[in-house]
């Protein structure tokens, strides 16, 4: 992983910790199962897999104690949640807006998410799960 990608991961950790009100160490260690920590971990795993191209069997380098099967489960579960729960989709779009502008711009171009959904998000409000 080059320096740019390392910085992307650090920014993502910071944004996730602010969004889900937890410490970076709480979601990078497989110790707690509180809802906000699990959701923060799920965001981080999905971001690493989808946008940083980290393989499932290498997730253990970023989240201590992570098994590849757990990583696969979290990615599939997160995709299902984005499809069924609009608040999770809004949080994901908000996360990309603050963490990675390149991916946010790609998301706006991608036809999977309508522009109306992206434009109607109030980025100043706090989304609470």
Predicted ranges, named:
Residues 38-54:
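Short, amphipathic alpha-helical "recognition" segments used to contact nucleic acids or chromatin
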Residues 1-3:
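Solvent-exposed, charged helical/coil patches
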Residues 18-41, 66:
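Short, Lys/Arg-enriched anionic-surface-contact patches
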Residues 57, 61-74:
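Short, basic interhelical loop/turn and adjoining N-cap
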Residues 13, 55-57:
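Helix-turn-helix DNA-binding elements, focusing on the entry/boundary residues of the two helices
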Residues 28, 52, 70:
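Ser/Thr-centric signal marking residues that sit
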Residues 66, 77-129:
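Intrinsically disordered, low-complexity basic tails/linkers immediately adjacent to helix-turn-helix/homeobox/MYB/SANT
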Residues 8, 12, 40-41:
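N-terminal positioning helix adjacent to the helix-turn-helix/winged-helix DNA-binding module
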């Amino acid at each position: 992983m080059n320096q740019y990608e390392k910085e992307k991961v650090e920014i993502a950790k910071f944004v996730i910790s602010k969004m889900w009100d937890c410490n970076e160490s709480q979601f990078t260690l497989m110790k707690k199962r509180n809802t906000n920590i699990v959701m923060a971990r799920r965001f981080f795993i999905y971001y690493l897999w989808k946008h940083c191209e980290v393989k499932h069997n290498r997730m253990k380098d970023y989240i201590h104690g992570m098994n590849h099967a757990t990583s696969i489960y979290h990615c599939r579960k997160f995709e299902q949640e984005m499809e069924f729960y609009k608040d999770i989709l809004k949080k994901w779009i908000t996360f990309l807006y603050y963490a990675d502008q390149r991916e946010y711009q790609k998301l706006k171009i991608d036809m999977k998410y309508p522009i109306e959904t992206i434009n109607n998000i109030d980025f100043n409000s706090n989304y609470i799960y």
